[in-house]
């Protein structure tokens, strides 16, 4: 799979930039969507595509036929007060992404979703679940990854919860939830995305949960 074209949305973000760097190091050709004027924020070596992630007509024609489409866009620093943004940005962007992917004839769609069910962030989870439904309905072979929180630079406050997770894993009634909603590192997330990109399912949809994301 090395060298295959990849189209990335969210390439200027926290996960997108390191992922693009990893893909370029593996000799993939990376086309990356960015807002007009933000192209310089993409890693060097990526081929910039200026467009609006909420409007498929602004970027669908720039997706190489047969490429893998990786959708990483989401509301920055999500919290319960951002329910309107989850509908507008998270759901709106995957709606545009699936439409563009179908139009372009992509071979594989990779969607960064979120672990669920979850007892908190219900509006966020609901938007991502609806996004998953759009991916499935597209009919494109797809991989859906479901992390809960990705630890990395500027995103480390959940480290305070690690002792709490350890206790939950010892309790039979909460063990499965603790694993499903566990924390993953940025490096593990990047590696899981690369694996997904380079090993697409022949058909249907593959779901990658937290325990598999943690595998390095």
Predicted feature descriptions by range:
Residues 89, 93-96, 159, 180-195:
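Substrate-positioning beta->alpha
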Residues 54, 117, 150-152:
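Conserved sequence/active-site signature of Rossmann-fold short-chain dehydrogenase/reductase
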Residues 3-26:
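N-terminal Rossmann NAD(P)H-binding glycine-rich loop of SDR-like oxidoreductase domains
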Residues 183-216:
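Alpha-helical substrate-binding/gating segment
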Residues 75-138, 143:
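Conserved Rossmann-fold NAD(P)-dependent oxidoreductase catalytic core, especially the SDR/UDP-sugar
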Residues 143-172, 179:
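Flexible, glycine-rich beta-alpha linker
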Residues 7, 31, 143:
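Conserved beta-strand positions in the Rossmann-like core of class I SAM-dependent methyltransferases
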Residues 38-96, 100-103:
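NAD(P)H-binding glycine-rich loop region in Rossmannoid oxidoreductase-like domains
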């Amino acid at each position: 799979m090395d060298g295959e074209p990849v189209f990335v949305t969210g390439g200027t973000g926290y996960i997108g930039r390191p992922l693009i760097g990893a893909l370029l190091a593996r000799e993939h050709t990376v086309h990356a969507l960015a807002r007009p004027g933000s192209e310089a924020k993409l890693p060097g070596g990526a081929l910039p595509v200026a467009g609006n992630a909420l409007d498929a007509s602004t970027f669908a024609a720039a997706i190489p036929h047969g490429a893998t489409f990786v959708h990483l866009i989401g509301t920055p620093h999500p919290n319960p007060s951002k329910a309107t943004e989850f509908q507008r940005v998270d759901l709106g962007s995957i709606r545009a992404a699936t439409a563009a992917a179908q139009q372009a004839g992509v071979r594989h769609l990779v969607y960064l979703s979120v672990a669920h069910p979850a007892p908190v962030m219900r509006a966020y989870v609901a938007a991502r679940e609806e996004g998953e439904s759009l991916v499935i309905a597209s009919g494109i072979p797809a991989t859906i990854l479901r992390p809960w929180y990705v630890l990395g630079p500027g995103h480390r406050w959940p480290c305070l919860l690690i002792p709490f997770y350890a206790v939950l894993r010892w309790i039979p009634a909460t063990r499965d939830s603790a694993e499903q909603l566990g924390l993953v590192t940025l490096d593990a997330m990047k590696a899981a995305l690369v694996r997904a990109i380079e090993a697409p399912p022949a058909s249907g949809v593959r779901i990658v949960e937290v325990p598999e994301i943690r595998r390095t």
